[in-house]
């Protein structure tokens, strides 16, 4: 059973495209077609507007919080082809960096695991993915994967930081030898997996095909110490797939259809323990799904967006149309 614990009146003047809680769950960032990014303090069920950030010249599609070990940092991306990195200094939010290296709308931003440093992946309608790495003293290094997806890239999601050969931790005193990976989804109906080579260049490692229309979102599940890697994907075709890879050396991924919805599915998002998947669709509902003991995914609850109503949990084996 799911309950609505808080409703925030953002006072955005147009459609809200994204809302993200910070690491501690005390701040909420929102973005809208009104070209603004807003940050609210939502502690104790309240809502205090902390910042109204203006800098984009078009609809703002997505926001992403960096890990707090780097300070209070928020990234936003927009139809105006720009990525803006905002930073809070002495209680005031200001533009820290602006990336204008794309030729079309930037649709998705995602921070890498904090273990790698401050790295931001950005997916654009120009088909490219750019990776911004903070090098110190206000400087950002930019790498770009051109033609990552023909027609355009809609989503990027990093793999959790796991050391090869070690499921949970690395030997003390040794610097971990992380292999950086992320997934992307595009208008070519594909999910692609990317890996950083030893020379620092990014290489396409795998191509996952199952969707029959644009891939709208991808979400790499958090690691909980198991050797299995899991990715969720959703599409314009109304389908949500769960992709699993049990053997990193073979890099073989198997898709399982979670559900076929009657409308476009915009977003998928994992719980921090990777056992519940939230699915957001074009029919104004958010559904929550959990894997049962027999490996089937079942809907455990659904919430009508904007209305705060919650349905009863469905019994195992039932399928609930979103």
Swiss-Prot record:
It comes from Homo sapiens (Human). WD repeats lie at residues 11-50, 55-96, 101-144, 148-204, 210-253, 260-299. It is found in: Cytoplasmic vesicle, COPII-coated vesicle membrane; Endoplasmic reticulum membrane; Nucleus, Nuclear pore complex; Lysosome membrane. The modification N-acetylvaline is found at residue 2. At the nuclear pore: component of the Y-shaped Nup107-160 subcomplex of the nuclear pore complex (NPC). The Nup107-160 subcomplex includes NUP160, NUP133, NUP107, NUP98, NUP85, NUP43, NUP37, SEH1 and SEC13. At the COPII coat complex: interacts with SEC31A and SEC31B. Interacts with SEC16A. Interacts with SEC16B. Component of the GATOR2 subcomplex, composed of MIOS, SEC13, SEH1L, WDR24 and WDR59. The GATOR2 complex interacts with CASTOR1 and CASTOR2; the interaction is negatively regulated by arginine. GO terms for cellular component: COPII vesicle coat; cytosol; endoplasmic reticulum membrane; ER to Golgi transport vesicle membrane; extracellular exosome; GATOR2 complex; intracellular membrane-bounded organelle; lysosomal membrane. The GATOR2 complex is negatively regulated by the upstream amino acid sensors CASTOR1 and SESN2, which sequester the GATOR2 complex in absence of amino acids. In the presence of abundant amino acids, GATOR2 is released from CASTOR1 and SESN2 and activated. This is Protein SEC13 homolog. It is a peripheral membrane protein. Belongs to the WD repeat SEC13 family. The modification Phosphoserine is found at residues 184, 309. Gene3D superfamilies: YVTN repeat-like/Quinoprotein amine dehydrogenase. GO terms for biological process: cellular response to nutrient levels; COPII-coated vesicle budding; COPII-coated vesicle cargo loading; intracellular protein transport; mRNA transport; negative regulation of TORC1 signaling; nucleocytoplasmic transport; positive regulation of TOR signaling. It comes from the Eukaryota. Keywords: Acetylation, Cytoplasmic vesicle, Endoplasmic reticulum, ER-Golgi transport, Lysosome, Membrane, mRNA transport, Nuclear pore complex, Nucleus, Phosphoprotein, Protein transport, Repeat, Translocation, Transport, WD repeat. The gene is SEC13. The keyword Protease does not apply. It holds the Pfam family WD40.
């Amino acid at each position: 059973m799911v309950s609505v614990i808080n409703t925030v009146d953002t006072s955005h003047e147009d459609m809200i495209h994204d809302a993200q809680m910070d690491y501690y769950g005390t701040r909420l960032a929102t973005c809208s077609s009104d070209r603004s990014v807003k940050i609210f303090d939502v502690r104790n069920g309240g809502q205090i507007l902390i910042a109204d950030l203006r800098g984009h010249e078009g609809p703002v599609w997505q926001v992403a919080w960096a890990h707090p070990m780097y300070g209070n940092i928020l990234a936003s991306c927009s139809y105006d082809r720009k990525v803006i990195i905002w930073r809070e200094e002495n209680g005031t939010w200001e533009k820290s960096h602006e990336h204008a290296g794309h030729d079309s709308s930037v649709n998705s931003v995602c921070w890498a695991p904090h273990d790698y440093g401050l790295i931001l992946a950005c997916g654009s309608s120009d088909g490219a993915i750019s990776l911004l790495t903070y090098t110190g003293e206000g400087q950002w290094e930019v790498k770009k994967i051109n033609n990552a997806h023909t027609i355009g890239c809609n989503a990027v999601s990093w793999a959790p930081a796991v050391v090869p050969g070690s499921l949970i931790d690395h030997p003390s005193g040794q610097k971990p030898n992380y292999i950086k990976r992320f997934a992307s989804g595009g208008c070519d109906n594909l999910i692609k997996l990317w890996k950083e080579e030893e020379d620092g260049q990014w290489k396409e490692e795998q191509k996952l095909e199952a969707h029959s229309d644009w891939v709208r979102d991808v979400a790499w599940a958090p690691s909980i110490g198991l050797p299995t890697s899991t990715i969720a994907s959703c599409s314009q075709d109304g389908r949500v797939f769960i992709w699993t890879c049990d053997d990193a050396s073979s890099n073989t991924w198997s898709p399982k259809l979670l559900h076929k919805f009657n409308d476009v599915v915009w977003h998928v998002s994992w719980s921090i323990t990777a056992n519940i998947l939230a699915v957001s669709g074009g029919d104004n509902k958010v559904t929550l799904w959990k894997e049962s003991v027999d490996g089937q995914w079942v809907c455990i609850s659904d919430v009508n967006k904007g209305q705060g109503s919650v349905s009863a949990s469905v019994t195992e084996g039932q399928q609930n149309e979103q």
